[in-house]
Curated annotation (Swiss-Prot):
Optimum temperature is 105 degrees Celsius for ssDNA nicking, 75 degrees Celsius for nucleotidyltransferase activity on a ssDNA substrate. Optimum temperature for ssDNA closing is substrate dependent, being 55 and 75 degrees Celsius for the 2 substrates tested. Topoisomerase activity is only seen between 55 and 75 degrees Celsius. This is Replication initiator protein. Plasmids from hyperthermophilic archaea are relaxed to positively supercoiled at physiological temperatures. The gene is rep75. It comes from the Archaea. The active site is at Y448. It comes from Pyrococcus abyssi (strain GE5 / Orsay).
Amino acid sequence: MVIYTSKFKNSLLDGLGVGHLSYDDQPILCNEVHPTLTLDTFISGGSSGSRPRPRWVYLDISTTNEGISEEFSSNTESKSPLLKVCGVSSKSSEGDGSSFIWFDKYRSVISRLEHSGFVEVERTVLKLRKISKELRSINKQLSRLFLDDRERAKLLSRKRKYLDFARALIGSISKSLTLYADRFFVEVPQDYAKLIQKLGFSSDTLLLHLFVNSGVLEVFLDDNSSHKFRIAYISKVHAGKYHPVKGISKGSQEAKRVLRDLLVLSELLEGSLVSYRSGGVETIHHLIPVRHFVLTAPKELSFSIWASLKKGDSSLFRAFKDAGAKAIKEFLSYLASKEHISGNLLFGFTINVHVTGDKNPFEPHFHIDAIVTFICYDKSSTKWFRLNPLLSESDLKKLRDIWKNVLLSYFGELLSEDTKSKDFDVWAGDNYYSLPLDVPQVFFELKYASRKLFVNFVNYFEQSNFDESSVSDWDFVRFVFEYSNRTERYGFLTNIKRYLSMSCSHLVEKRVQELEEFISRIEFDLSVNGNKMSDSLKRALLERLEYLKDELSELKERGFEYLFERALEKAEELLSNDNLTLERVIHILETLFTALGKSIVNYNFYVELEDVSFREFVDYLYDNHLSDVLVFSDRHRSITIIRLIPPPDGGVPV
């Protein structure tokens, strides 16, 4: 049996001395009622009604899509049947209804479960950020000193709705097997396959093979209780070139590389980030803030860049990317000057140029997707500074002004007077993240920025039908499918080891002092109390002493190189697929427990099934006579929870 435990440091999931807890196997909600109310419904006061067609278009980012081959032959054989999405035949540009038989049955987790006899009975939308934000707002208002009885009763009524909903949903999860998956595993629109066919791509490009891990997740709460949940998730996947999972995997791989370096920075800069914004007094910070920005080109400019690319000229494209980097640097310099930080400053951020959007991926919509760290390095003083990530309305106006001025300086001659007279779009999100606390969230944002952009067509077909007569430029559509969406690093992110080595020599001295102090304490304890200790405790202290002495010797010999390698190894361990997936599941559960006034402080995951084919997983569901299955379809900002039940006769798994 494999056991995974929480590994992210400094977070609520660290484990705060919670051990030897007795747990209650009974769910919080002991009745047999499942939640039937969506958050949208109970917040607005409406009725749940029948299942609606999705009204949103937002890229969701998978946490488990490693091991994807660049091409996957349709002749690949496996000893066990696997989930297979064949799409439509590329031999005929027209095709017929029968071409979609395999696609309909095997294109997704939901279709496979339904084909195996499970019946969908309910959907619940869980908007994570909205819940957290609303609860914080309610609690803040309830803490006001002067609050009349009517206002208090109204706030408590709103809070009670969240509490009742959370209890019901936690109870449902406690009694079910929950399958967590990115939404591109869960459901893929049929019209996306029609587009693949129209473009003349082989059906092999929609191949999908899935493997599953399943086990028991035990979470420990801050009230000294614990709860168990049966959790499954996608552990491995092989996808064809144009399956949306493949598009997301590109983002996953790049996100891990960038996030690994950010975690190394957070590890080695802990306690070394300086700020002057508190009345001019120097303060020290431990966390690295990160924000997501989008800088959009005017429509007129987007079409000009595409026209240039279509002719084989990439000069406008390169200039647009340079303009984005310049605008971000100017804005960060402005923020630094506000906090009286000066010098030879170097900032750190990534940029992706997106050539189209989610709303209409069939036409050019060029924009800069930037993931920005709110720290900077002064090459003159070799100090690291933290910038305030809370942006005012005047800050956002400054960013819009900077973006417009930079674009006009680069492309003014190409733009009409009407375009020049308008504001240029800028998006800065509604929150920021802190590393190393918010690793899963930052991973999602990086993955979103680095994805293959043909994924946008999947988003589009969630709410729109394929109508080839409305497509005016098929060359652009093909360009989107082949576009690499390269992630560019800027500033200190181009070589973090170089800049850390220039500024962190004191870290070696600090760590040497810590190790020498630890060694001294253990040696003193052994000399004074060694005869009174149990054999097991004494043996443990001796082993720890030997380990610390080895580390001290290595540190004195190799210095900063040793510290950097240790931080790198730690970061890579944290970014394993299993850790990222489990931390995401914990984040979802944490949102529910927060509504109950509780918090998760630690967890263990006991693996029972490891890397089994999806067919074997379905057989497992039948063999264990599980009452129902909850599918958590992760959309990043929200979770669609789909409840399926097996047929009364037990069904025939296929």
